[in-house]
């Protein structure tokens, strides 16, 4: 220990050795008192630190126990829900299997009906083939009949030509008959004229004969009477022969002309009758052939319609079976995907639970290590802890809206940040505060959030750094957000607004996060949207974010208010400043949750 030089009295009188010894002892005692005071202060500070650490450890144990019990209850409820969902899925799967069995039975019935219809179709196709053969045969017969018809028509045409020729011949013969009749009349007239001429000449000849006889009577008195009679007889005979020959020629010519005309007329009539009979028979055969063709055509069209209807029914049954098969395959795939998602979700929850257990175990080990260090120091110093700090925790809850508070506390040479848990409350905030008596002043600022909603859509979360805003559909129905606007105003600054697309729909129970363009998040609708025209939502002291529907009505709002608090402490600046609260941080990426504990 170094000594302090002893000076003389002001008057210059030297001090006695006893006085010097007393002064040295006094100085040494003062130094020892100072060291003792420093030691006592240090011990007091250590005791306060031990008390603070013990309180923190107890609170950490309480928080850890509460968190573990809460997480345990949460996961037990989630596991119960998962088991319930699995049971419902199993029931649904059993129901679907029963339905699949029914559908398989129906499918078998459809297959049997299809086979029956197929057999009927085969029979119908065989019948169609037979009818086609019959149709081809009928077509062949029809072709034959048509050929016969054409030949008969040709014959009829020939007969008509012959009839025309016969009619022409008949007309010619008629004309010839008329001519011959005229000739006969003319000949008869000529014959009559000749007869009259003959009679006249006969009379003339007789008169001449009489005159000649009279003349010869005078001349031939001597002529024999027999010779005169002979000459008269010869002359009469010659005249009679000439008359008979002329009559025979006229009768023969008349008879021949009448026979020729009658024969030609009878031949023409017979040919016309035969042609009429042949044409009538051809018409009857053609009519019968047409009737048979029409009957076969009707039968064929009926069978074709029946076959087409059967094919349409078979096609409809096949399409129905394919549709039902695809439908049940899709349902099974959807159920399998749901079960896979549930398994993945359960595995993720189990992983998070395991991570939380690992964090709890690490915290327990760290707390145990600090407890052992403190107990060892207390035993070494033989000190007993004297708690001199007071910790108060206050919470308020309600049921209509939610709010959160962030408390940041500053002191000389130290800065601590305590973030409070977001609680449900109507215009209230859940905050945690801690106080230690001291003499130095401290300042803090408080961030409080208040949220409310009049419909099913609420502003679930906002980033204090202006990266994103998250909305949630709290109902069990899909909500259309077409042409809705999400607006934000910071203080008295300019209002910014994000407009949803006309066809955007927020699914039931789902959330959507609208990120700024500078956040570096990729656009992945419908759950992640990027505001490409705006880099950030902005930050500031007083932030008001609200959702407006297509009618201009405000349906949800969330406000963030920042306030500064200054406190005076009664301890010296070397004494510790203390504040503690359960921490659930709202800042950062909403897709990840960070939980931790810091031991100051």
UniProtKB/Swiss-Prot annotation:
Disulfide bonds: none annotated. This is Lamin-B2. It comes from Gallus gallus. The keyword Metal-binding does not apply. Belongs to the intermediate filament family. The lineage of its organism: Eukaryota, Metazoa, Chordata, Craniata, Vertebrata. One of its GO terms (biological process) is nuclear envelope organization. One of its GO terms (molecular function) is structural constituent of cytoskeleton. Its main location: nucleus. Homodimer. Lamin dimers then assemble into dimeric head-to-tail polymers. Ultimately, two head-to-tail polymers assemble laterally into a protofilament with a uniformly shaped rod of 3.5 nm in diameter. Residues 237-379 are annotated as: Coil 2. A lipid is attached at residue 597 (S-farnesyl cysteine).
């Amino acid at each position: 220990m170094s000594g302090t030089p002893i000076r003389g009295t002001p008057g210059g009188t030297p001090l006695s050795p006893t006085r010097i010894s007393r002064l040295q002892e006094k100085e040494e005692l003062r130094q020892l008192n100072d060291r003792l005071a420093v030691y006592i202060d240090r011990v007091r500070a250590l005791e306060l630190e031990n008390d603070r650490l013990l309180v923190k450890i107890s609170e950490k144990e309480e928080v850890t126990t509460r968190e573990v019990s809460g997480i345990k209850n949460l996961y037990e409820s989630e596991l119960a829900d998962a088991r319930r969902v699995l049971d419902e899925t199993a029931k649904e799967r059993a129901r679907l299997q029963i339905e699949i069995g029914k559908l398989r039975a129906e499918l078998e019935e459809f297959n049997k009906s299809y086979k029956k219809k197929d057999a009927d179709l085969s029979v119908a196709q065989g019948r169609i083939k037979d009818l086609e053969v019959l149709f081809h045969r009928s077509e062949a017969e029809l072709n034959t009949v048509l050929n016969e018809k054409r030949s008969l028509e040709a014959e009829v045409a020939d007969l008509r030509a012959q009839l025309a020729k016969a009619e022409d011949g008949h007309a010619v013969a008629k004309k010839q008959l008329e001519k011959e009749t005229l000739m006969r009349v003319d000949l008869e007239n000529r014959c009559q004229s000749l007869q009259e001429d003959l009679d006249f000449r006969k009379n003339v000849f007789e008169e001449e004969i009489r005159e000649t006889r009279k003349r010869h009577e005078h001349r031939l008195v001597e002529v024999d009477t027999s010779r005169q009679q002979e000459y008269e007889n010869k002359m009469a005979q010659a005249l009679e022969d000439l008359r008979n020959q002329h009559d025979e020629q006229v009768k023969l010519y008349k008879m021949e002309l009448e026979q020729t005309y009658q024969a030609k007329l009878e031949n023409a009539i017979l040919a016309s009758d035969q042609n009429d009979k042949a044409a009538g028979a051809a018409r009857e055969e053609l009519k019968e052939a047409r009737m048979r063709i029409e009957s076969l055509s009707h039968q064929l069209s009926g069978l074709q319609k029946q076959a087409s209807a059967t094919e349409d029914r078979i096609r409809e049954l096949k399409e129905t079976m394919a549709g039902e098969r695809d439908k049940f395959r899709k349902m099974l795939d959807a159920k399998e995907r749901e079960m896979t998602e549930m398994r993945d979700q359960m595995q993720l929850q189990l992983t998070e639970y395991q991570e939380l257990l690992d964090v709890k175990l690490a915290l327990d080990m760290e707390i145990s290590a600090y407890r052992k260090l403190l107990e060892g120091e207390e035993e070494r110093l033989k000190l007993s802890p004297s708690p001199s700090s007071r910790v108060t925790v206050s919470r308020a809850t309600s049921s209509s809206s939610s709010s959160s508070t962030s408390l940041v506390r500053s002191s000389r040479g130290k800065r601590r940040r305590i973030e409070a848990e977001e609680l449900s409350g109507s215009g209230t905030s859940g905050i945690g505060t801690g106080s230690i008596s001291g003499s130095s002043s401290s300042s803090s600022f408080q961030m409080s959030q208040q949220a409310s909603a009049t419909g099913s859509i609420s502003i679930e979360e906002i980033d204090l750094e202006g990266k994103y805003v998250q909305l949630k559909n709290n109902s069990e129905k899909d909500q259309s957000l077409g042409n809705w606007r999400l607006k934000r105003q910071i203080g008295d600054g300019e209002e910014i607004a994000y407009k949803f697309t006309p066809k955007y729909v927020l699914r039931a129970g789902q959330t959507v996060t609208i990120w700024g363009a500078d956040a570096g998040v990729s656009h992945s609708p419908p759950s992640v949207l990027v505001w490409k025209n705006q880099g950030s939502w902005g930050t500031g002291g007083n932030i008001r974010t609200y959702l407006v529907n297509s009618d201009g009505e405000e349906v949800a709002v969330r406000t963030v208010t920042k306030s500064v608090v200054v406190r005076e402490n009664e301890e010296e600046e070397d004494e510790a400043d203390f504040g503690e609260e359960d921490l659930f941080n709202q800042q950062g990426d909403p897709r990840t949750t960070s939980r931790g504990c810091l031991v100051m």
